[in-house]
């Protein structure tokens, strides 16, 4: 591979599709970053709602902003396009409908240089728009770097944000500054699967020498409602994501070493996705007949999933160890799900309506 040239300290890659209502604010957040030596790469994934015109307004004003427009190819292809055009020493991937504090790039870049780290992770907020509730990642990061493999194993424990006392690394991408050379030299590409972030984060951790952390809350991810059909179908598609992860571990020669961790991860991954889809359905349907129909469909899909031989194999393995190292809420919910998908859905709705809001 040719030597990688760094024209900027950081390349900010913002991918968007029909984000006219939110894109202006996000680009402003990127422009107003206190780190001056940066470029902003805007990838339009076939928008038709005026998003491209908003992006062009900023590109015409600032020389460090570049726009690339393509037919609708999905988030993974958009991010790869952004990476191919980037010239920064580090890259960061932001979504076109979120918000960022102005010092994020400067703080993360300075930590990366101080520690000579390949990746720097930060804290974040999740904003549930449907119920107007803002939550933050609860666990403090360590004040020392980890090796990439240590961060990877921690991620397998945590899944996304089950908030165990020893587990703090999560599989989101927008909170992480990544050395561009790490991605390019290892030919790491985005996978066209659901929850592509966690697959990508696994890959970069496995190739990283050092991962650092900052405890600042810089990024706010807004959880918006998707379509009901896609919210249920994502459960079917999750098996492909898990197969991709298993293939990755085998390719790296660490599947046997991590097999027990992976089985627990498998269960918590399905728990996280199913729990999130129940949230989407709970807060996005006002018509009682439609609500009941989708609820029945979801219960049917959950019955299919728990009937998978892989699911039962992982469940029996975790059960044999008393569900050790699986966090309390996932542990309870997985037991309920394995007993009755209907009870699992009803209890999940109860938790959302009476606990998440408070």
From Swiss-Prot:
One of its GO terms (biological process) is lipid metabolic process. It comes from the Bacteria. Gene3D superfamilies: Spore Coat Polysaccharide Biosynthesis Protein SpsA, Chain A. Its EC number is 2.4.1.-. It catalyses: cholesterol + UDP-alpha-D-galactose = cholesteryl 3-beta-D-galactoside + UDP + H(+). Belongs to the glycosyltransferase 2 family. This is Cholesterol galactosyltransferase. It comes from Borreliella burgdorferi (strain ATCC 35210 / DSM 4680 / CIP 102532 / B31).
């Amino acid at each position: 591979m040719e030597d990688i040239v760094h024209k900027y300290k950081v390349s900010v890659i913002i991918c968007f599709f029909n984000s006219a209502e939110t894109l202006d604010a996000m680009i402003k957040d990127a422009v107003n970053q206190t780190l001056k030596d940066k470029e902003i790469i805007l990838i339009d994934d076939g928008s038709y709602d005026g998003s491209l015109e908003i992006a062009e307004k900023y590109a015409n004003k600032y020389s460090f902003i570049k726009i690339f427009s393509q037919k609708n190819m999905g988030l993974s292809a958009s991010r790869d396009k952004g990476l191919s055009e980037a010239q920064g020493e580090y890259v960061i991937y932001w979504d076109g409908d979120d918000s960022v504090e102005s010092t994020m790039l400067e703080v993360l870049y300075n930590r990366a240089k101080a520690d000579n780290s390949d990746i720097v992770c930060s804290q974040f907020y999740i904003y549930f728009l449907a119920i107007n509730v803002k939550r933050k990642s609860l666990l403090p990061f360590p004040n020392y770097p980890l090796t990439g493999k240590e961060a990877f194993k921690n991620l397998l424990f945590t899944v996304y944000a089950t908030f165990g006392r020893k587990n703090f690394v999560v599989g989101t991408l927008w909170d992480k500054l990544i050395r561009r050379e790490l991605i390019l030299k290892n030919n790491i590409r985005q996978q066209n699967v659901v929850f592509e972030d966690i697959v990508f984060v696994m890959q970069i951790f496995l190739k990283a020498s050092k991962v650092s952390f900052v405890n600042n809350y810089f990024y706010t991810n807004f959880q918006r409602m998707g379509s009901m059909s896609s919210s249920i179908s994502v459960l079917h598609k999750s098996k492909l994501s898990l197969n991709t992860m298993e293939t990755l571990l085998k390719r790296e020669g660490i599947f046997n070493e991590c097999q027990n961790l992976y089985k627990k991860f498998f269960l918590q991954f399905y728990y996280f996705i199913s729990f999130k889809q129940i949230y989407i359905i709970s807060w996005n349907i006002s018509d009682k007949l439609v609500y009941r129909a989708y609820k029945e469909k979801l219960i049917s899909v959950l019955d299919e999933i728990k009937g998978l031989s892989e699911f039962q194999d992982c469940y029996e393995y975790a059960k044999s160890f008393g569900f050790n190292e699986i966090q309390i809420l996932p542990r309870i919910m997985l037991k309920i799900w394995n007993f009755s998908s209907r009870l699992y859905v009803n209890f999940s709705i109860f938790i959302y309506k009476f606990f998440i809001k408070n």
